[in-house]
């Protein structure tokens, strides 16, 4: 739900994503299949998921060891969008709807739906 909301806010869809990064120790130890099954993450092709580990530490290290990267920071900052959830229409309702496992709209999770059908659970 959060991913769908953020994509909608910037005018993109899941099909526009080349990669889906799950950073930090959480991402490294996460079972992607289980996370998709319960609706935590979108039902993307699994090869689109990247779990880079401690990406903030890796980024800081790269910047400290290659000062030429400083010139890229301004470009990156210009591309950042702030989205205030306090002003988001229907955000709370969408989050409540997403609290069901796997999700209130199973059609958003076609691989999960297929698994449930195969097991006779739908």
Predicted regions and their residues:
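Catalytic phosphate/nucleotide-handling subdomain of diverse soluble enzymes
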Residues: 2-76
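Acidic, glycine/GT-rich loop-and beta-edge segments that sit at the periphery of enzyme/chaperone cores
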Residues: 62-122
């Amino acid at each position: 739900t959060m991913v769908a909301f953020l994509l909608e806010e910037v005018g993109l869809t899941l099909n526009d994503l080349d990669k889906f990064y799950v950073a930090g120790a959480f991402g490294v130890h996460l079972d992607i299949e289980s996370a998709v099954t319960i609706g935590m993450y979108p039902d993307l092709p699994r090869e689109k998921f990247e779990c880079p580990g401690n990406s903030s530490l890796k980024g800081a290290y790269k910047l400290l060891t290659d000062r030429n990267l400083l010139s890229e920071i301004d470009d990156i900052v210009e591309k950042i969008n702030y989205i205030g959830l306090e002003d988001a229409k229907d955000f709370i309702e969408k989050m409540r709807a997403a609290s069901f496992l796997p999700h209130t709209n199973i059609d958003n999770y076609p691989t999960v739906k297929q698994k449930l059908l195969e097991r006779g659970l739908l």
